[in-house]
Amino acid sequence: VEEGDSLHRVSERLKDEGVIRSALWFRRKGQEEGIDRLIKPGTLVIEPGSSIQDVFAQLTVDRQQRQQLRVTFPEGFTLYQMANRLEEQEIVSAEDFLTAVDAYYQAGDYDFDDTQLYFPLEGYLFPDTYFFEVDVTADDIVRVMARQMEQVLTPEWRQRAEELGLSVHELLTLASLVEKEAFGDFERPTIAGVVYNRLEIDMLLQFCSSVIYGLDDGQELANRLLYRDLEEMHPFNTYQLKGLPPGPIANPGRSSIEAALYPEDNDYLYFVVGDGGHNFSREYRDHLKNVEAYRNRTDE
């Protein structure tokens, strides 16, 4: 529940989440009891079988007056990084979180091939700041984060992905590449454009971020690449294998997903780190000049 959310907005979301059957009935009951004037922001964890009074009670609790656990997952965090953060903040253990992720996946209805994935739900938990009750379980956390991603992927965005010929899995995979490569929102659509351009001409993506992800089975323990790493064969080595990797390499934020859906219309094929962002080029000879300029700066 966000600051300023109306009873109408809350009721529609509860219906979408399957908590209530009728948003209209919920609003009428809420208005009768004055709930529409008492809604407080925060994360709700509603157990199956909860009564409407239980839901009203959660909606009206001032979370600033009760102890809550706050955890932030930056955009681009992997599931492994999320697990470690939860353990570091003593919310749940990393092992329990990853076990809960797997259980949620097994209970879900996903239609992608998971045989080459280290964590099948990589990319499917929305990175954000969450507030949980002190007795929250790993299952609760995974459910809240997965459903938040489902909310972000609106029907309009799903339709747009279909128009582009992308499944949701491919969309999140592409968005995760943009997330890991971009310096900021200003260049996400440009990088997305490069991805589409390379895919269109059957060119290797050659993204270092995907190679790093595959080196340590999704744990991202490596902080730099060696030339020999680019030759090591694994499913996420986009220097060796054409097309998108088999799945997301991180959990993308809203801006990267939007960029993947609405890429910049450009003819760039190359980019390299520049001053405060990336330098993009259409021709390989220009790319080599940009690479040389980057090396000269790092040698200074």
Regions found by a protein language model. Give the residues of each.
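Signal peptide-directed extracytoplasmic domains
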Residues: 1-152
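Bacterial extracytoplasmic/cell-wall-associated proteins, especially those involved in peptidoglycan
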Residues: 80, 85-92, 103-300
